[in-house]
């Protein structure tokens, strides 16, 4: 199958193809230089967006507020305490930003009470238990980002399964 109409078009097509390949190669090289933290932040951003959308019609997990100006995706077990639970949906819930998540450092006593109601004793006990540390990689972070992008799209379309 012929892609171009003649020699002049072939030269132009060849140059454009080479430019596209060069741009793609540069992008691959730039991406390889980005640190792991770049990919983790991107994954966490979309994960948190998903959690806020998932819990949009629910009150703050800690204080029950429904009218906060800003909402966070608050972690019951902090990322600093256990990075393995950073993207675990049982560990992340909608939380009012200024009062509970910032001023009260997560309002953990009331967060735990809210979790007990929401996920039950068995899952809460699992969450509070020991978890094998996992090494985060760029590939895993990119996979997490893709996973939550897809879940967010499905949620917005109304596909909750």
Where are these regions (language model features)?
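Short metal-coordination and nucleic-acid-contact micro-motifs, chiefly zinc-binding Cys/His arrays
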Residues: 1-5, 53-58, 88-92
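Short Cys/His-rich Zn2+-coordinating modules
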Residues: 40-49, 76-82
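Short cysteine/histidine-rich zinc-coordinating motifs and their immediately flanking basic loops
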Residues: 1-7, 16-23, 71-79, 107-114
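Histidine-centered nuclease catalytic patch
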Residues: 61-92
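Short Fe-S-cluster ligation motifs
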Residues: 31-38, 89-100, 121-143
């Amino acid at each position: 199958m012929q892609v171009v109409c003649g020699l002049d078009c072939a030269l132009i097509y060849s140059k454009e193809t080479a430019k596209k390949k060069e741009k793609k190669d540069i992008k691959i090289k730039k991406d390889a230089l980005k640190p792991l933290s770049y990919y983790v932040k991107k994954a966490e951003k979309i994960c948190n967006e998903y959690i806020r959308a998932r819990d949009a019609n629910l009150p703050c997990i800690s204080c029950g507020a429904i009218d906060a100006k800003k909402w966070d995706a608050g972690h019951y077990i902090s990322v600093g305490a256990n990075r393995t639970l950073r993207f675990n949906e049982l560990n992340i819930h909608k939380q009012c930003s200024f009062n509970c998540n910032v001023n009260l450092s997560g309002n953990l006593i009331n967060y735990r009470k809210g979790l007990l109601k929401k996920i039950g004793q068995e899952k809460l006990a699992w969450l509070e238990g020991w978890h094998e540390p996992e090494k985060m990689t760029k590939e895993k972070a990119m996979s997490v980002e893709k996973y939550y992008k897809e879940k967010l799209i499905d949620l917005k379309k109304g596909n909750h399964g």
